């Protein structure tokens, strides 16, 4: 079987470097999740607060 790539790269780094990479990846993940939730909330808020138009013809009149 193929060896685990993360383990191969980790073997070339010190414990402190590995911890630093792990923390950085964790905070990037938290940032991504936070932005996703924020954008979803903003879009949902805008969709709920905007009037719903049933068809483009009604929008013109």
Swiss-Prot record:
Stretches in topological domain Cytoplasmic: 44-61
Disruption phenotype annotation: Decreases the number of ER-mitochondria encounter structure (ERMES) foci in cells. Abnormal mitochondrial organization within cells, manifesting as fragmented or aggregated mitochondria, spherical mitochondria, or absence of mitochondria. Decreases the level of phosphatidylethanolamine (PE) in cells. Decreases growth on glucose (fermentable) and glycerol (non-fermentable) carbon sources. Simultaneous disruption of ept1, psd2 or psd3 leads to decreased growth on glucose carbon source.
Pfam families: Emr1
Keywords: Membrane, Mitochondrion, Mitochondrion outer membrane, Transmembrane, Transmembrane helix
Transmembrane spans: 21-43
Annotated InterPro entries: Emr1
Compartments (UniProt record): Mitochondrion outer membrane
Mitochondrial intermembrane side: 1-20
One GO CC annotation: cytoplasmic side of mitochondrial outer membrane
Membrane topology, record value: Single-pass type III membrane protein
BP-aspect Gene Ontology terms: intermembrane phospholipid transfer; outer mitochondrial membrane organization
Family per record: Belongs to the EMR1 family.
Complex and partners: Interacts with the ER-mitochondria encounter structure (ERMES) complex. Interacts with mdm12. Interacts with mdm34.
Function, as annotated: Mediates the formation of endoplasmic reticulum (ER)-mitochondria encounter structure (ERMES) foci, thereby contributing to the formation of ER-mitochondrial contact sites.
Protein name as it appears in the record: ERMES regulator 1
Organism: Schizosaccharomyces pombe (strain 972 / ATCC 24843)
């Amino acid at each position: 079987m193929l060896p685990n790539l993360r383990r191969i790269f980790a073997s070339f780094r010190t414990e402190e470097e590995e911890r630093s990479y792990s923390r950085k990846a964790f905070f990037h993940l938290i940032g991504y999740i936070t932005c996703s939730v924020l954008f979803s909330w903003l879009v949902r808020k805008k969709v709920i607060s905007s009037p719903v138009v049933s068809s483009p013809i009604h929008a013109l009149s």
